[in-house]
Amino acid sequence: MIIKPRVRGFICVTAHPAGCEANVKKQIDYVTAEGPIANGPKRVLVIGASTGYGLAARITAAFGCGADTLGVFFERPGEEGKPGTSGWYNSAAFHKFAEQKGLYAKSINGDAFSDEIKRLTIEAIKQDLGQVDQVIYSLASPRRTHPKTGEVFNSTLKPIGHEVKFRGLDTDKEVIKEAVLQPATQEEIDNTVAVMGGEDWQMWIDALLEAGVLAEGAQTTAFTYLGEKITHDIYWNGSIGAAKKDLDQKVLAIRDSLSAHGGGDARVSVLKAVVTQASSAIPMMPLYLSLLFKVMKEKGTHEGCIEQVYSLYKDSLCGSAPHMDQDGRLRADYKELDPEVQNQVQQLWDQVTNDNIYQLTDFTGYKTEFLNLFGFAIDGVDYEADVNPAVKIPNLIQG
């Protein structure tokens, strides 16, 4: 079939297998060109491995550190007449290139919050790898079924304590709009923490430790975003921020248990704002990102997922002098938080109107990166060609 982008709101409901493969190849080429990372992990579990930062971590571990990787994700395969999800095609491409390089790659498709997927993962590690020495936690999900109680929690994106008026960019109509978000109830905050907080990360590490599949000295990290004051009301000081602060709490107990296990470590890693399927759903993010791209590209400091994660590995996860803040988090977002960058973004924020969107922001760059997520608008891909949407992932365990 010929596959074209079909965008509905902040999601593209189609994905292109050849485009997704080209996108993965581009990230692999970047890592290969940057060169091998010393003291890297050799057996890595990536939870949330199919898109965004999780995919970038899997690529960096494999092609930067020469690691065998086991990836966990929840994606839908394509079938005749219906494309699969971009994460499915990304993972199929990753497997293909890892295999060509002689690297072990196995994936598990299912709900990472469930006990069943944890069990299947532990079995796969025991059978193939023995143990893993690094666990990347990069799940982005709007809901979670609690594995012990069966209760379903939904996350909410709202401020806490007061309503927030904010400017946003309607990406469909391409207009600036003012909007108001009502504050979250306590139940909404608690539910968001249940979905996006640190409980599941801790459950994973506890299960892996108990099963004896974490190597002594193993490290784990979960990815987070902090941002600056422009986004704080909605993000860091809102319901999602409450979940991110829960990560900061939970990491302490995880760090203690790994430290006692042969001197291992657990850290929260703070990464910059990028276009992902998760970030495009946050009301003010498209405008913020369009402005941030404009300013950072002019300064020559613009980075996407792969550049961020490669530097996180090289400098902090594997380096001898990690970028660490006073709260013990690893930081890769310092170029975004450069006061000069933030001041320029803030100034432009107040000046943007419907008439000057394309002059004051890099909305064009934002739109291109958004389409890239789904395998579209990528140079060198023939979008008029007939492609088969049914792509198999070799070495896949279906949960």
Curated annotation (Swiss-Prot):
GO molecular function list: enoyl-[acyl-carrier-protein] reductase (NADH) activity; NAD binding; trans-2-enoyl-CoA reductase (NADH) activity
Catalyses which reaction(s): a 2,3-saturated acyl-[ACP] + NAD(+) = a (2E)-enoyl-[ACP] + NADH + H(+)
UniProt: NAD(+) binding residues: 48-53, 74-75, 111-112, 139-140, 244, 274-276
EC number: 1.3.1.9
Alphabetic keyword roster: Fatty acid biosynthesis, Fatty acid metabolism, Lipid biosynthesis, Lipid metabolism, NAD, Oxidoreductase
Record-listed substrate binding positions: 225
Site (Plays an important role in discriminating NADH against NADPH): 75
GO biological process: fatty acid biosynthetic process
Enzyme class: oxidoreductase
Catalytic residues identified in the record: 235
Pfam families the record matches: Eno-Rase_FAD_bd (PF07055), Eno-Rase_NADH_b (PF12242), Enoyl_reductase (PF12241)
Associated pathway: Lipid metabolism; fatty acid biosynthesis
Family of the protein in this entry: Belongs to the TER reductase family.
Role this protein plays: Involved in the final reduction of the elongation cycle of fatty acid synthesis (FAS II). Catalyzes the reduction of a carbon-carbon double bond in an enoyl moiety that is covalently linked to an acyl carrier protein (ACP).
Quaternary structure annotation from Swiss-Prot or TrEMBL: Monomer.
UniProt protein name: Enoyl-[acyl-carrier-protein] reductase [NADH]
